[in-house]
Amino acid sequence: MPLRQEWAVSIAIVRCDRIVLPDYRHLFQMSLPPEFVPSQLGWDGADALKITMASTLDLGLCIEDVRIAGHAQPITLRSYRPASDGTVLPVVLYFHGGGFVRGSLDDADVTASTIARDTAAWVISVGYSLAPAFPFPAAPEDAYRAAQWAVANARAQRADANRIGVAGHDAGGNLATCLAAIARDRGDIVILAQALLAPLLDPSMTRMADENKVRSPDIGVTECAQCYRAYLPNASQRLHPYAAPLESRRLAGLPPALIASAQHDLLHIEAEKYAGELIAAGVPTEVTRHVNASHNALAADPAALADVVAFFKKRLRARTLAPLGDTLKIQTISTT
């Protein structure tokens, strides 16, 4: 039976890129510098690319911070809830970026508040534990505890614990899809949708774009290697399915996905490769490449966030999982 045209396009992209990808694995032989601190890494970027905390006074949102028990230490959750008209809200857990070693709830404020307001959802932004102080599996276990807290408190927030989505940027995209896998495997939480913005998915760094050809203004291969060394100090962890989604052979049963990649991002190939793997596993998947965007900028890009909002409105409206075989949508969007 011939492949559907949309599927063939996706597979062609993956095959072409794999031929020319450089091998960055030698970077794992480098030790972390003794003075290694997250603020040294390229995610700080240019001032123009920094995500500043949004003014939430006029967004019509009730925003509050909550402390819960995490895997290795207490963590903070930031709750964004739209003004209620009596409607029961869906739930979205959001995970900030920062390469597993930096980032904060404040960094995620623009994205989380936009999703809450425009989707009309109860959004919980998760302040998960950061490496190197708290390496894997602290972050995904924190994510799971945040999901458990959301389920336990949904009724009090007039939210529906049966309509949960997850989303994240960069390392947060990794945590979002890994949380979906953990929830599937443990069986006590059902996640209906996942939206991944420029996700950081491949600790092997064998699917990363050529740094000499993709002019990334905000992250580089050395920074990625340092982050993975800090987050996954044991080499065997770089194959764990809850740390390396692209290495997983058990993608069936994951929720429908939206994956947004940025043209000027070293990670766009692995993001699109993951989309192909999800499709092959029967997971309904939409892919959008933003051709004039960079890695950091995608987290608060209006076009990307509009796609996320539309995706969650569609996927969290129903109370049942979407049937297999949805059409893959591959788009390229100019942000200029």
What does each model-found stretch correspond to?
Residues 1-82, 313-336:
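A glycine/proline-hinged amphipathic helix-loop "lid/cap" segment
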Residues 88-97:
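Short beta-strand element of the alpha/beta-hydrolase
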Residues 106-125:
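Short amphipathic alpha-helix adjacent to the substrate-entry channel of hydrolases
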Residues 134-154:
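Alpha/beta-hydrolase active-site loop
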Residues 151-166, 186:
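Gly/Ser-rich "nucleophile elbow"/oxyanion-hole loop immediately N-terminal to the catalytic nucleophile
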Residues 181-236:
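Hydrolase active-site cap/lid region
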Residues 259-261:
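Short beta-strand/loop motif that positions the catalytic acidic residue
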Residues 293-302:
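Catalytic histidine-centered segment of alpha/beta-hydrolase-like enzymes
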